[in-house]
């Protein structure tokens, strides 16, 4: 696995570069990406936004927001006791895909969560995308216990029609 530098993204330039990677990696238009102002607000309110760098070039990113473990029918539980991260999106420039950067970003996200005392990270992925399945289950050891049909609704870009 090739080593790249991974560090938090904190500047408006970082957020704009993240948007460009989002569009390139997922084949999206600007309207279908997370705006830089939203990334800035999320990053300053408990979200974890990390970037992978090859030298000075941002080549990939991962975003996770704070959430709570679902406890249907139990609104009396204190949220702090149910904290988790929800890994929202990861994007890697096509020229750098397949080099283990996704694994490195996910592991860095895990380390950041553990430093905060958060012991659970959840995310969604399409089980028919074999590369994602290999990463999530094969490499990261994720446990799948739920399937949501059409979780994100109609999608654009690379995921259109899935």
Q: Where are each of the predicted segments found?
A:
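A conserved beta-strand-loop-helix scaffold within acyl/acetyltransferase catalytic domains
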Residues: 4-94, 126, 148
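Conserved acidic functional residues
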Residues: 126-127, 133
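Conserved acetyl-CoA pyrophosphate-binding loop and the N-cap/start of the following alpha-helix
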Residues: 96, 100-108
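Conserved GNAT acetyl-CoA-binding A-motif
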Residues: 113-126
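Conserved catalytic-core motifs of GNAT/GCN5-like acyltransferases
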Residues: 69, 124, 138-158
